[in-house]
Amino acid sequence: MTDRTCLSIVLAAGEGTRMKSNLPKVLHRVAGLPLVCHVVNAVRGTGKSDVALVVGRGAEDVRSAVEKIAGPVSAFEQKERLGTAHAVLAAHEAIARGYDDLLIVFGDTPLIEAQSLLAARERLAQGADLVVIGFRPASPHGYGRLIEEGGQLVAIIEEKEATDEQKKIGFCNGGLMALRGQHALALLDAVGNDNAKGEYYLTDIVAIAHGKGLNVTAIEVPVDNVIGINNRAELAEAETIWQNRKRRELMLSGVTLIAPETVFFSYDTVIEPDVVIEPNVFFGPSVHVASGALIHSFSHLEGAQVGEKAEIGPFARLRPGADLAEKSKVGNFCEVKNAKVGKGAKINHLAYIGDAVIGASSNIGAGTITCNYDGYNKFKTIIGDNAFIGSNSSLVAPVEIGDNAYIASGSVITADVPADALALGRARQETKEGRAKILREKYAAIKAAKSVSK
């Protein structure tokens, strides 16, 4: 396959009116990634392929989203909506460059897998001229039927045009196709619009190709591979299927999920073997968790790196730039953002650590805050190795605390603290014997006077 050139035409011009959204349909997300980007990733999984996007509303946004994951692509606007074959021909310029294979896919089918598309391309390599991707749903009602004779696909018949006998066929059209490049333009140009809607249907090329004596065949893929997204309910269903795939993949690779159905991953989440994830955990984009880590319940991770045997949560939040070394700990009700946490360092309770470096084996007490923002600019806090930050301390950045330094509880630290130093930044306590009794009597009298006046 590696020596066959390929053009993948991604049809992404649909209006998506049933989504009831200002956002183009193909930019809605499954697992944090736009639908169309899932499709492009699947295409790229078949080997080297140029991509031609057929776009409509939000064309530049769609193109930009795809180019973030795939690099430069060609985009062609479908100015009129005259059917699927018409949409493919919007990319006429790209097709005319000449390719061994053409893949025709839809930008709203995020669950298509690379191996399904690769199977279609392999059929082309074996001599087929046109390969249609089909599936067998539990009920074929409403789907176009794939009509086969003698091992060849001869036509696609829509439900409303099918005979009673044809309606019994369970093999249905998934819409996606692979086409030998040398025949592509001739077949597409032969599609007419002699139908009730006056549109050019891509499905017609099956009968056209068969009539020309070409080798036309179909392959079967799992039903979920060809699910199209038309509304928010179907978007949620696709999310569920994607998450279930990812959960199974991770568990089979050696990750323990205590309650799999409650853990949600992003398209690029990487979890190494021997990680344990408790219930109700959410992974945003760009998270890597190293072997042996423990993620407790109700934690939220995004843009974070978690080292070997680190421990997170429960109720912890790791934001972009959080980088935790091995055996470090971020405990309950802690937030870490754009900070490096050294080996064995502990941030156990009720803390905010932002724009900081925490040295190895340092201990950050409960209620510690790095005051990193003055309303205009961010500033950095640097804490050395084996430092102890007492509870309820405020570290006003920019500030540096040396190795083995000790910050007394309740301190507000505004100046650098040298290594091995003790810093106290709080008012001296005053204790006045008997004053509590006097205050109680005073306040009780005031309250009683207010009650009488009412």
Swiss-Prot record:
Annotated catalysed reactions: alpha-D-glucosamine 1-phosphate + acetyl-CoA = N-acetyl-alpha-D-glucosamine 1-phosphate + CoA + H(+); N-acetyl-alpha-D-glucosamine 1-phosphate + UTP + H(+) = UDP-N-acetyl-alpha-D-glucosamine + diphosphate
UniProt-listed PANTHER family: BIFUNCTIONAL PROTEIN GLMU (PTHR43584:SF3), NUCLEOTIDYL TRANSFERASE (PTHR43584)
Cofactor note: Binds 1 Mg(2+) ion per subunit.
Subunit record text: Homotrimer.
Superkingdom classification of source: Bacteria
The protein's name: Bifunctional protein GlmU
Span list, region Pyrophosphorylase: 1-232
GO MF annotations in UniProt: glucosamine-1-phosphate N-acetyltransferase activity; magnesium ion binding; UDP-N-acetylglucosamine diphosphorylase activity
Main location: cytoplasm
Binding site for Mg(2+): 108, 230
Family annotation (HAMAP family): GlmU
Gene: glmU
Keywords: Acyltransferase, Cell shape, Cell wall biogenesis/degradation, Cytoplasm, Magnesium, Metal-binding, Multifunctional enzyme, Nucleotidyltransferase, Peptidoglycan synthesis, Repeat, Transferase
E.C. designation(s): 2.7.7.23, 2.3.1.157
Compartment list: Cytoplasm
Cofactor(s) it depends on: Mg(2+)
Job of this protein: Catalyzes the last two sequential reactions in the de novo biosynthetic pathway for UDP-N-acetylglucosamine (UDP-GlcNAc). The C-terminal domain catalyzes the transfer of acetyl group from acetyl coenzyme A to glucosamine-1-phosphate (GlcN-1-P) to produce N-acetylglucosamine-1-phosphate (GlcNAc-1-P), which is converted into UDP-GlcNAc by the transfer of uridine 5-monophosphate (from uridine 5-triphosphate), a reaction catalyzed by the N-terminal domain.
Region of interest (Linker), ranges: 233-253
Annotated CDD domains: GT2_GlmU_N_bac (cd02540), LbH_GlmU_C (cd03353)
